[in-house]
């Protein structure tokens, strides 16, 4: 399609034959990119409605590169809108990693409803090698920027707006603000095109035509497809034989109660065993947090595990349970970097410093944005076996 897209495809293949190599796209991606012609520049508005994990982000990456190439002479830029600070951080990290080999600069601005001096410097950068081509932020922050005339201040046209989690248009709390933002961009930013990503939206074609106008083509489609199945199971301790006095042995069983397509339904419960390091008797194993820890310890053999609890203080206690000697590992460069940061910020006694040596991370609203971002970073790079979060 264009040189940037061609180079992007080459970088996907050149990663090597590992978990990160990509040799073919998923069926929904193929339909969007090839059959429906998403890479064409004639469509002003596109709504992509696909289930979670169907590859919407990769579709967006191809469309972003096409938009950058289309307005390369004007040094046009793309706004990628995510609804939460955490998702902004996650998207910015991924886009930087993917676009850095292509020379594309990706920046993010905080959701704070002000443009500080650091962001002013970033937005007004005039060096072709350092100026951003993709800006990741929240809808509220972009709304502030548009109302304050930042497209003019930046001096380069806004060429594409990618809206992640676009079903928020239907939200009673945030939908009206997002709708007004898109309407404002549609009327004031003459070069702007739109790509809306959502796992579900009831009026995708209507939204696409609203943004695209009568003289523009539009495309909206939905595909009931996922690359894998999802299993919902219930883990519970089962009392075994008496071992001494009033104490009983135990095991933890996992019963599948729901799968998305009934492909992984299992008639009998799965015995995931016991863990005497976490609980020696049935009464000790009957605590909900202990059951969660035993289950997570068993499942981590298949890959990293996210364990959720309802309150930060319970998150900490659950994370402490997973500090088992069998989980201890020698900290590598990434882990040591995070530990050094935590020591500088919180002191040597901060419990998270020791936890990550066991492959255990913590993530909740009581931690600073920087710490939460570092936990996500370690988890993405496989440095954490467990991420305990609210």
Give the residues covered by each predicted segment.
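N-terminal pre-P-loop "Q-motif" helix
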Residues: 21-42
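Conserved C-terminal RecA-like helicase domain
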Residues: 2-21, 51-54, 70-123, 129, ...
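Conserved nucleotide-binding/hydrolysis micro-motifs of P-loop NTPases
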Residues: 85-88, 113-115, 140-143, 167-168, ...
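Structural recognition of the conserved hydrophobic beta-strand(s) that form the central parallel beta-sheet
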Residues: 80-81, 134-138, 160-162, 192-199, ...
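Walker A/P-loop NTP-binding motif
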Residues: 34-41, 54-73, 94-96, 180-186
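Conserved interdomain linker/interface between the two RecA-like ATPase lobes of SF2 helicase motors
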Residues: 183, 193-319, 361
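SF2 helicase catalytic motif II
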Residues: 132-135, 139-143, 149-194
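Walker A (P-loop) ATP-phosphate-binding motif of ABC ATPase nucleotide-binding domains
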Residues: 45-47
């Amino acid at each position: 399609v264009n040189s940037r897209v061609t180079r992007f495809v080459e970088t996907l293949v050149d990663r090597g034959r590992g978990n990160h190599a990509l040799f073919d796209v998923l069926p929904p991606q193929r339909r969007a990119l090839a059959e429906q012609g998403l890479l064409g520049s004639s469509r002003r508005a596109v709504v992509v409605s696909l289930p979670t994990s169907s590859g919407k982000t990769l579709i967006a990456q191809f469309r972003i590169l096409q938009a950058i190439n289309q307005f390369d002479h004007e040094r046009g830029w793309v706004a990628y809108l995510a609804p939460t600070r955490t998702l902004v951080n996650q998207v910015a990290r991924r886009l930087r990693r993917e676009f850095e080999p292509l020379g594309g600069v990706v920046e993010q601005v905080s959701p704070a409803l002000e443009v500080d001096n650091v962001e002013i410097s970033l937005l007004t950068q005039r060096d072709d090698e350092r100026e951003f081509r993709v800006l990741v932020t929240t809808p509220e922050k972009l709304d502030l920027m548009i109302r304050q005339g930042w497209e003019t201040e930046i001096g380069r046209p806004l060429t594409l707006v990618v809206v992640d989690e676009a079903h928020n248009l239907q939200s009673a709390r945030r939908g009206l603000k997002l709708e007004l933002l898109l309407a404002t961009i549609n009327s004031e930013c003459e070069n702007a095109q739109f790509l809306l990503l959502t796992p579900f939206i009831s009026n995708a074609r209507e939204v696409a035509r609203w943004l695209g106008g009568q003289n523009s083509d539009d495309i909206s489609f939905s595909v009931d497809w996922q690359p894998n199945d999802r299993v919902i199971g219930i883990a519970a301790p089962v009392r075994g034989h008496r071992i001494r006095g009033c104490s009983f042995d135990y095991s933890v069983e996992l019963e599948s109660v729901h799968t998305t397509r009934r492909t992984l339904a299992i008639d009998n419960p799965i015995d995931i065993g016991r863990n005497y390091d976490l609980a020696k008797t049935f009464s000790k194993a009957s605590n909900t947090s202990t059951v969660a820890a035993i289950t997570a310890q068993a499942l981590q053999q298949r890959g990293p595990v996210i364990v959720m609890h309802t309150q930060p203080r319970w998150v900490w206690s659950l994370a402490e349970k997973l500090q088992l000697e069998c989980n201890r590992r020698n900290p590598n460069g990434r882990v040591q970097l995070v530990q050094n940061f935590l020591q500088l910020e919180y002191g040597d006694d901060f419990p998270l410093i020791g936890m990550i040596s066991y492959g255990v991370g913590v993530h909740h609203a009581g931690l600073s944005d920087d710490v939460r971002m570092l936990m996500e970073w370690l988890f993405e790079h496989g440095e954490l076996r467990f991420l305990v979060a609210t």
